[in-house]
Amino acid sequence: MEKLYKENEGKPENERNLESEGKPEDEGSTEDEGKSDEEEKPDMEGKTECEGKREDEGEPGDEGQLEDEGNQEKQGKSEGEDKPQSEGKPASQAKPESQPRAAEKRPAEDYVPRKAKRKTDRGTDDSPKDSQEDLQERHLSSEEMMRECGDVSRAQEELRKKQKMGGFHWMQRDVQDPFAPRGQRGVRGVRGGGRGQKDLEDVPYV
């Protein structure tokens, strides 16, 4: 379908329909009128023509099935362009007759609720998976955020402790090494107390 859309991108829709299905102009005009009514409705709802067509293609009921068949015929013709056009005419002649019936069956008032209903159906079908995935992603992301925050806070606390305690300990060790043990020895009367005092006297004050 994308290939067909790309090939026919530059052409107006009326020409696309006539060329792809190979119908006479009278039949094409009836179909174009039916399509223009359908295309105006999605535009009124603020949708582009492409979205309107895609939703119309997937629509349940007679019209959706017929359009799917028409799309298959288009694909078959685009793949094998050597086929004569007479093969596609019987199905294409039946198509415009059934389209007015479908248009009569559902007036413009019914069109909008069906679309809305189909949207909600799509939403309910897709929403459990999507919502679960979204919840899992959100949950994972929140867990990751908590872990990262926890890791960052722990790292900051450890850095603070190291800066406060570690730096202070190193300062104490530097201070304690020359002075404290000797002073303690001298005070306690442990052997070598005199040596410590001698060493203190021998060391020049800087």
UniProtKB/Swiss-Prot annotation:
Its main location: nucleus. Keywords: Nucleus, Transcription, Transcription regulation. The keyword Manganese does not apply. It holds the Pfam family BEX. InterPro entries: TF_A-like/BEX (IPR021156). Residues 27-42, 57-70 have a biased composition (Acidic residues). It is found in: Nucleus. Residues 1-206 are annotated as: Disordered. Residues 1-26, 43-56, 71-86, 102-113, 121-160, 196-206 have a biased composition (Basic and acidic residues). GO terms for cellular component: nucleus. The keyword Transcription regulation applies. Belongs to the TFS-II family. TFA subfamily. May be involved in transcriptional regulation. This is Transcription elongation factor A protein-like 5. It comes from Homo sapiens (Human). The gene is TCEAL5.
